Amino acid sequence: MPQNKKAVVVGALGVIGRYIVEKLLAEGDWQVVGLSRRPEKEGPRYRHISVDLLDLEDVARKLSGLADVTHVFYAAFQPGTGAAANYATVIAPNRDMLVNSVTAVARASRRLERVVLVTGTKYYGTHLGPLKTPMRETDPRHMPPDFY
């Protein structure tokens, strides 16, 4: 089976990112590049790049060789500390990590077809306080400020 699909999974060692990596590799026709701050063991179709997504120069240098990437799955999130009221302090760094990584891949690869932004329950405002239950996917999202 030809391996012409190549994915970059940003946040590859996180809760969601590691399952995206696992799923893509299980499908058999993907090559996967995982990005995270921590190093990770590589495999036959898996390469890992340890990178600081907030350091634009580090990102540009380390991702410049990704000329054949077709997909980016963005699952990284840098949490803040303290109460939900401090959530506004994590918006800028998370936005910057997203912009830095996707921009670097888009510049390196002329084959980029799709970027997938993986979101969670913060889309609905769970970080702002109690919500109605049960929640439904059709519930309205909370309005910005948010990095999503």
Give the label of every model feature segment.
Residues P2-E27:
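N-terminal Rossmann NAD(P)H-binding glycine-rich loop of SDR-like oxidoreductase domains
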Residues K6, T70-H71, R114:
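Structural motif
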Residues G11, S36, T119:
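Short beta-strand/turn micro-motifs composed of small residues
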Residues G14, F77-T81, T121:
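Flexible cofactor-recognition loop at the NAD(P)H-binding site
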Residues Y19-I20, P44, A83-A84, T126-L128:
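Short glycine-/acidic-enriched loop or helix-start segments at secondary-structure transitions
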Residues G28-R38:
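Conserved glycine-rich Rossmann-like NAD(P)H-binding loop of the short-chain dehydrogenase/reductase
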Residues E40-K41, R47-D96, N100:
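NAD(P)H-binding glycine-rich loop region in Rossmannoid oxidoreductase-like domains
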Residues Y74, V99-F147:
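Conserved Rossmann-fold NAD(P)-dependent oxidoreductase catalytic core, especially the SDR/UDP-sugar
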